[in-house]
Design a protein with these regions (language model features):
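Short amphipathic beta-strand and strand-loop transition segments with alternating hydrophobic
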Residues: 64-65, 146-152, 205-207
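A short, amphipathic edge element
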Residues: 26, 57-58, 135-146, 199-201
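Gly/Pro-enriched, hydrophobic low-complexity segments
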Residues: 79, 90-92, 100-104, 110-114, ...
Length: 259
């Protein structure tokens, strides 16, 4: 009997760690969120609109983010070309988990609020919608996340997570391939509401280690029906830097000045 007990204890030593440290979809997505957290950031970005024939139209933008009291605000400013220069886009997160969004269009010289019904519309001709710009795909309280399997993406080991939104969403679900080493998304499929068709696919083209953290340096979003793509490349990024909250106001949105 004593030997049997010893044997069972040895077996338990192998089994219990696996049970205690079992990985769930929610735990993985929480790691994804934690990996990407920063009190503030400033990014210079090269954005390319890629037609199905390969023609590319380039934009240069700057994006600032500031998180205060757990709420993240983002301002995006278009720097070039001249046709979109000084276009500014503001997203402010609310305590109820929703977002307020405004856009300033220089040609109209006014600020326009983005209604919830406009969330699925294209952001500045890109393959990202207004809702994508305030995406809660990775939020553990905005979707149910299930670990489906593990597989390899571009020679990197990944968790495959199915995320079904709890609240209103433009998508029926997303499937996310999360890098097991860096916890960065390597690939995301965005599905129709009936779950039968992949509408858009996001691919991480390059990851990099900068400012003491892993980041997605280049990503491409493709609308599968049209084969139109949008590539976003981070030229420079700084994190946890002093940031004036005046940038995240409708006053700055309209004037381009911090009052």
């Amino acid at each position: 009997m004593k030997r049997i007990k010893q044997f069972l204890m040895i077996i338990a030593l192998f089994i219990l760690p696996a049970l205690v440290f079992a990985t769930t979809g929610a735990e993985i997505m929480q790691r994804v969120q934690d990996t990407q957290k920063a009190d503030s950031s400033a990014m210079d970005i090269r954005l390319g609109l890629i037609e199905s024939n390969g023609e590319v139209r380039e934009r240069r933008i700057q994006t600032l983010t500031l998180t205060e009291n757990g709420l993240t605000n983002t301002i995006t400013v278009f720097l070039s070309p001249a046709s979109v220069k000084n276009t500014r886009f503001l997203t402010r997160q609310r305590s109820d988990g929703t977002d307020d969004q405004w856009i300033y269009l220089p040609a109209l010289s006014r600020v326009k609020r983005i209604a919830a019904s406009e969330g699925s519309g294209s952001f500045m001709g890109s393959d990202f919608s207004y809702s994508d710009m305030a995406s809660t795909t990775y939020d553990t309280d905005e979707a149910n996340h299930t670990l489906m399997r593990e597989e390899t993406v571009n020679n990197r080991n990944a968790y495959v997570i199915e995320s079904i939104p709890i609240t209103a969403s433009d998508y029926g679900k997303t499937v996310i391939w999360v890098d097991k080493e860096t916890y960065l998304p390597l690939k995301v499929d965005f599905y129709e509401k009936d779950l039968s068709t992949v509408l858009k696919r996001l691919i991480t083209d390059e990851i990099a280690f900068t400012e003491g953290r892993w980041i997605t340096k280049s990503i491409t979003m493709t609308t599968l029906a049209t084969n139109h793509s949008t590539r976003i490349e981070i030229v420079q990024a700084k994190y946890n830097i002093p940031m004036n909250s005046g940038y995240f106001t409708t006053s700055f949105l309209e004037t381009g000045r911090v009052l």
